Amino acid sequence: MKKIYISLALIFSLNSISAELWTVSELNERISKLKHDLVLLDVRTQAEYASGHILNAINISHEQVLESPELMTVYKDSQMVVFCRSGVRAGKVIQLLESLGFEDIIDIDGDMLAGSEAGYRMEVNDE
């Protein structure tokens, strides 16, 4: 029952996300120009991640983050880019992280779909 309430709260509060919004072009430019590390958090499933992901992105599925938010505490003081395939799962994770006091979160407009459409190359894991 607790998970249902948390899920409903996240769904109804997605409109209040205050994360900074970058385009995929901005992300690509900032990855290549920034001197400090961005935490690139890919919240898709492991199978989606293996089929193609941004170089140096870490994969923690949105389900893992929602069920065990303590996994994210190591990144609390980092600038973090959160993304998924289309933005729905990333939005849920961003909302949760903001409720936990994370302040420097970036959302990607269009997420992985926009990156693919723009022709950005993805790294693929060979299994």
Task: Describe each model-derived feature in a short phrase.
Residues I4-S16:
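Sec-dependent N-terminal signal peptides
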Residues I17-L38, Q46-Q79, V88-E127:
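Rhodanese-like catalytic fold shared by cysteine-dependent sulfurtransferases
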Residues D42:
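Phosphate-rich cofactor/ligand-interacting catalytic cores and adjacent structured alpha/beta frameworks
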Residues F83:
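Short, surface-exposed ligand- or partner-binding patches at beta-edge/loop junctions that are enriched
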